[in-house]
Structures are given as structure tokens and as C-alpha cells.
Amino acid sequence: MKISESVRAVLVADENPMHPDFTGIYLIGKQGRQSLTIDSGEALDHYQWFLRGYLAAVEREEIAIATITHHHSDHSGNLKWAKEFLKADISIPANGRPLLKGRIPSKVDTLKDGDVIDLDGGVRVQVLATPGHSVDSLCFYIEEEGVLFSGDTLLGSSTTTVSDLAAYRKSLKRLLDLPNLKVMCPGHGKIINDPRERLQMYINHRDMREQQILNVLEGGGAISSWDIMLQLYPDIDKRLRRAADSNVRSHLKQLADEGRVKVYEGTPRKPKSAARVQREVEHVRQRDLAIKHGRKLEAERSRAEVRAQENPPTSDWKEPPRFELL
């Protein structure tokens, strides 16, 4: 999908309720010249198939540089694969390096606020530090074409999770002030063709949510973030409750830092024993292996069904009936 003169999008369908509609992989650069990819999806086969298939069918070239908007695995999961199979140089957010331990090649470049990636053909990609969703969140901007790559700082079909609300609000206002902003390419969801309106909507939404939280607290008595979340999101998909609670806690932290709410410290549970942690890790490993094996068997079954329709019924007939005109 062509976004601008230098930008193409590979939109991969995603069933995760946290990732509405699509997960976006973006290719930047003049076709036939050096290319940069921003985010490359989770370490799952279908992301790799989509990207390799697109490169083979449309780009007919390989990736020179692969980078990411932040460390979360649905954006960084294929960095080792991009290095090994696409032979790409890898660039990551500088302060995301410790968060990517074990998931990146041994040799990587790092990016920080103010850096510029210069590609062949005069394409200049600005690097913008936009913490808030995560501590290492970056956005990338091609000012000449007005194209912003927002990662999970803004999504195409919903609001995002926020780890540091004060930083996030500053990041939104910074993006709102970008010159020549025309289109936004989010980490998940549809391409945004009204980016300034969407940014302002995000700012307004966070202000609205803060006021709703204050309204609940004005009811009197100490209350947990979870109970506040249940009041604010009564009909939310249950699979998204913890994400919603995380955002409520981000609001409460900012309110506490500003001296507007009092915090009664909770009582944490005792840490799990090393043996229990190891059992849980092994359970997850065995479960994931079983799921992977099940998917393989499902693929084999599907292929067998296709073959059964493509070929004559040799399982029924050693010598099938034959027919001749009388």
C-alpha cells in the first residue's frame, strides 16, 4: 500500500484485541534504492511471510536498515530475523537497549532524539523521542512528505496504553506542533489522514479521563485503581481490563506527583520461589510447543484436504470406472 512518494505500508491482519485491525510494517525509501523498515512485527511466521512476500512481489529488493519505534515484542520480535535473513543493519532506541536483552543481534546501532537517517534519493527521516507509551518510544518523521510514524504513541482505531502520563502529554503536544504534518502511520490500526485532529482528540481524551477519575474520587473514601477502572469501563472487553487499569494507574500517579491525591500503599505479595517460577516458565514453554505443533498439524490437515480435491480418488479405486460413448 503506497502512502507517499517514499513510503509503503505492509498491513498485517491481527486478532489481538490490543491491536485493532492491523499491525503496520512500513518501508521507506525510493524504490530501487536503499530502504528502511520501521517495525517488523512479532516473531511469528505470518509477519515474516507478509514482509518477504511483499519484498519479493513488489519491492524486488532487500532492506538495508531495520529499526523499531520501541522495545515491545510486537514491534521488535523480528530484529534477529531481519539481520539474519534480510541482511539488514539494525537500529534501536538508545534507552531501549537494556529492555531488548536477548532479542537483538550482537551488533546494533542506536538512535536518539534529533538523529537523522539519510537514505539514498534524498529521503531524510527525523528521529523524535516521544516517551509515554514506553520509556524508549520513538517516532519517525519525513517532514518533506508530511509522514509521521507513530508506533504505539498513537493508534489508528483506539487509544493506547500509557506508562508515564506526564511524559506522554508532552509528547502529544510536541507532535501536534510538527510542521507540514499530513498523514500518520500508526503501529496498529488504519492509516490516519487527519493527524492533527487525532492528536488533539488524544489530548482531550486524557483530560476527560482525568476528570472522570477525579469525579469517582470525589465520591469519598479510598478506592483502588481496579475499582475505578470498573466504574469507568463497565462494558470493556474483559481481555483489556488490565490495560485499562494500567492507564488509570498512570493518571493516579500523575495526580499523586502533583499532590492532588493521597496514596495508601498496598501490601505486595511475597515473591514466588525460584522453583515455582521455573515450573511456570516450563509450563509456558510446553504450552507454546503444543500450540506450535497443533498449528503444524492444522496446516497439514488443510493441505491434505486440498490434495484430496485436486487428485483422483485413488483411496477408493485401484482402477476407476471408465466410460465410452455407445
Positions of the model-derived regions?
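Aromatic/hydrophobic pocket-lining residues that form the small-molecule binding cavity
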Residues: S76, Y168, V248
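Metallo-beta-lactamase
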Residues: Q34-T37, E42-L44, R124-V216
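Histidine-centered divalent metal-coordination motifs
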Residues: T69-H75, H133, H188, H251
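Short hydrophobic/aromatic-enriched beta-strand-loop microsegments
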Residues: K87-A94, F149-G151, K238-L240
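C-terminal regulatory/interaction regions
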Residues: V216-L326
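Short, solvent-exposed loop/turn segments at secondary-structure boundaries
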Residues: G102-S106, T159-S163, E197-R198, R239-R242
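Conserved beta-strand hairpin/beta-sheet module of binuclear metal-dependent hydrolase folds
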Residues: M1-V58, L138-G151
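Active-site HxH/HxHxD metal-binding segment of metal-dependent hydrolases
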Residues: D21, E42-V123, H283, L289-A290
